[in-house]
């Protein structure tokens, strides 16, 4: 009889242990609770990520607005939406050093109010930093009123410096204008990096001057030689040859009076010097 109570006690202790080891209803409840808690944690993390993305999206427009405000405060005036501009380089987009570059700027007023075009300017800038000026050209004052739905064309020219040849520079061409309310606008008609071309023709001022100097020097040498030859010819004496009268037929006797001619004919004719010399030589031989 004493053994039976002990067996019952062992059964009572062994049954709960077996239930716990097999994962009974209590164990499945604990596991379900753990899964529920994990799902809630994942959902919370997803919700937090969505909230962060929404905050980022909300911050981006704010940053853009701040950038625009900074540009409005520190930047230059912008172009008017009621105006349109075009540019045309007369000799193409070639920029030879120490040579005239000419272009035309067209302005179109698409609005309902007048625009006053004030000036047109151009400048060369450092390619990596457009705030650094390399060569700033004189602004061309225009002061031209352009009515609505009308167009105007302006001409401008500049000369790139000769030492800039063979290097790239940023070319900025600005058209400055305003409306009747006093609002100032600025349109960057051309804002690109260009390369200045070196002149290869070689016909610069120094070369032309050298050619002219050599031509003048050659002309002086030719004139000097000509004068020297002329002076030598003048120094040589000219030998005069005495020409006698070979016959009386070569002499015009019409101007002599007839009486004088009769007397000359009556008189004995003079012997020529050659005949006398011949007679003398014959007499000496005898």
UniProtKB/Swiss-Prot annotation:
The keyword Protein transport does not apply. It is found in: Endoplasmic reticulum membrane. It is a single-pass type I membrane protein. Residues 37-83, 261-286 are annotated as: Disordered. Glycans are attached at residues 136, 191. The modification Phosphothreonine is found at residue 260. Phosphorylated in its cytoplasmic tail. Keywords: Calcium, Endoplasmic reticulum, Glycoprotein, Membrane, Phosphoprotein, Signal, Transmembrane, Transmembrane helix. The keyword Endoplasmic reticulum applies. Residues 37-75 have a biased composition (Acidic residues). Residues 229-286 are cytoplasmic. Residues 1-23 form the signal peptide. The modification Phosphoserine is found at residues 247, 268. Residues 268-279 have a biased composition (Basic residues). Pfam families: TRAP_alpha (PF03896). It comes from the Eukaryota. Belongs to the TRAP-alpha family. TRAP proteins are part of a complex whose function is to bind calcium to the ER membrane and thereby regulate the retention of ER resident proteins. May be involved in the recycling of the translocation apparatus after completion of the translocation process or may function as a membrane-bound chaperone facilitating folding of translocated proteins. PANTHER family: TRANSLOCON-ASSOCIATED PROTEIN SUBUNIT ALPHA (PTHR12924:SF0), TRANSLOCON-ASSOCIATED PROTEIN, ALPHA SUBUNIT (PTHR12924). Shows a remarkable charge distribution with the N-terminus being highly negatively charged, and the cytoplasmic C-terminus positively charged. This is Translocon-associated protein subunit alpha. It comes from Canis lupus familiaris.
